[in-house]
Amino acid sequence: MASGILVNVKEEVTCPICLELLTQPLSLDCGHSFCQACLTANHKKSTLDKGERSCPVCRVSYQPKNIRPNRHVANIVEKLREVKLSPEGQKVDHCARHGEKLLLFCKEDGKVICWLCERSQEHRGHHTFLTEEVAQKYQVKLQAALEMLRQKQQEAEELEADIREEKASWKTQIQYDKTSVLADFEQLRDILDWEESNELQNLEKEEEDILKSLTKSETEMVQQTQSVRELISDVEHRLQGSVMELLQGVDGIIKRMQNVTLKKPETFPKNQRRVFRAPNLKGMLEVFRELTDVRRYWVDVTVAPNDISYAVISEDMRQVSCPEPQITYGAQGTTYQTYVNFNYCTGILGSQSITSGKHYWEVNVSKKSAWILGVCAGFQPDAMYNIEQNENYQPQYGYWVIGLEEGVKCSAFQDGSFHNPSAPFIVPLSVIICPDRVGVFLDYEACTVSFFNITNHGFLIYKFSHCSFSQPVFPYLNPRKCRVPMTLCSPSS
């Protein structure tokens, strides 16, 4: 009820020109009221004779001087703006401004309006349609847009999941790298600790040897001094005694005095001492980085038994050793121990056939006085002559190997010279520390085979370049005549 009254009041204070609530209302002689702006705009269209103008509603003439502000209507409009319509009047199907039902849709503004809004200045000239006419069309558009948004939502969720997964992956990778860095630097610290301990042991040994020698020299000098002191005392006693005491055995005393020879003690000039040199940390780091890099390609290598090799293989296929010597009985009950007559027949191949990629493995050769290891392109029966002279261990026969003899002689086997191609070119290798563990790195595409001394922090022992890999190659181990086994290390060792 109250809302209906308010609606009627709004109609009374609505400008007939703009159909909005009156703004600065002005009243004419006929009683109609208009917005000041609307009436001013209308003056240009309704001018009559003698300066008179006509009312836009009833066409009754009026004099501009008779126009007066309608304060009463202005107050009503002000109060009306402050009044809120009842909940019934605020329903979404009624215009908040005019209280009329919202039955029209303005295409230009994209709004639902009432019939009074359609006639207002704001929507004049716009294309309007009944809401029922456009509802289905916009429902289809909204449904299509909704499907598109749902697809976008799904894509966004997938992207969110991807970025979350990438974030977790990066976190895992960084954590792994942190662990690797900690492990690497821990290993470097172990290397430095080993170098420090080794150098201190050398200094302690040097101190012990020098002090022992000097102590011996000191003892000899004390004895020598005491002998001279006793001889001086004897001579002084003779000089202070009687003539008989002076002459008794005087020739012997004089001879003893003349034969006195002072033996100079053994000394150790400081300029001849071994000079301590700190390890080359830069070179050590470079070697360490290279070893760390190739160890990323560590493969688990085991050996493959065959009918050619006489090598003894462990059950886990990791250890290879020389067979038991054969007992030969000679004349009169004498016995002789003989080994297999050629080193070739104690060689064994790894079970992995390599035709591409990068591969790394390590072999434990500690306590062995002889061994050969590296890469082999397969056994070559036609190269089994003069095996004792290592003539088959050449790249031309498919061998890229290094070896140890007599516990100290480390060598690499290269192809023979042009004049004597059958005889291998033995390359003596200078190793500061004899390796107890050797790393082998094969880069098939780069045609290289590298050997690392793991015992000496991974320093490079030797590298074969420009290798001709025309067929599959295999890891190769040969324990020679040393019965101590050589062991293929697992990647986790």
Curated annotation (Swiss-Prot):
Region (Required for interaction with GABARAP and for autophagy), start-end ranges: 185-198
Molecular function terms from GO: pattern recognition receptor activity; ubiquitin-protein transferase activity; zinc ion binding
Short name of any one Pfam family annotated for the protein: zf-B_box
Zinc fingers, B box-type class: 90-132
Entries under InterPro entries matching the protein: B30.2/SPRY, B30.2/SPRY_sf, Butyrophylin_SPRY, ConA-like_dom_sf, SPRY_dom, TRIM/RBCC, Znf-RING_euk, Znf_B-box
Superkingdom of origin: Eukaryota
Residues binding Zn(2+): 95, 98, 117, 123
Post-translational modification: Degraded in a proteasome-independent fashion in the absence of viral infection but in a proteasome-dependent fashion following exposure to restriction sensitive virus. Autoubiquitinated in a RING finger- and UBE2D2-dependent manner. Monoubiquitinated by TRIM21. Deubiquitinated by Yersinia YopJ. Ubiquitination may not lead to proteasomal degradation.
Intracellular or extracellular location(s): Cytoplasm; Nucleus
Zinc finger (RING-type): 15-59
Keywords: Acetylation, Antiviral defense, Autophagy, Coiled coil, Cytoplasm, Immunity, Innate immunity, Metal-binding, Nucleus, Phosphoprotein, Transferase, Ubl conjugation, Ubl conjugation pathway, Zinc, Zinc-finger
Xref: SUPFAM superfamilies: B-box zinc-binding domain, Concanavalin A-like lectins/glucanases, RING/U-box
UniProt entry tagged with the keyword Phosphoprotein: yes
Official protein name in the record: Tripartite motif-containing protein 5
Self-association state and partner proteins as the record states: Can form homodimers and homotrimers. In addition to lower-order dimerization, also exhibits a higher-order multimerization and both low- and high-order multimerizations are essential for its restriction activity. Interacts with BTBD1 and BTBD2. Interacts with PSMC4, PSMC5, PSMD7 and HSPA8/HSC70. Interacts (via B30.2/SPRY domain) with HSPA1A/B. Interacts with PSMC2, MAP3K7/TAK1, TAB2 and TAB3. Interacts with SQSTM1. Interacts with TRIM6 and TRIM34. Interacts with ULK1 (phosphorylated form), GABARAP, GABARAPL1, GABARAPL2, MAP1LC3A, MAP1LC3C and BECN1.
Domain remarks in the Swiss-Prot or TrEMBL record: The B box-type zinc finger domain and the coiled-coil domain contribute to the higher and low order multimerization respectively which is essential for restriction activity. The coiled coil domain is important for higher order multimerization by promoting the initial dimerization.
Main localization of the protein described in the UniProt heading: cytoplasm
Function: Capsid-specific restriction factor that prevents infection from non-host-adapted retroviruses. Blocks viral replication early in the life cycle, after viral entry but before reverse transcription. In addition to acting as a capsid-specific restriction factor, also acts as a pattern recognition receptor that activates innate immune signaling in response to the retroviral capsid lattice.
Annotated source species: Pongo abelii (Sumatran orangutan)
Similarity comment: Belongs to the TRIM/RBCC family.
Modified residues (N-acetylalanine): 2
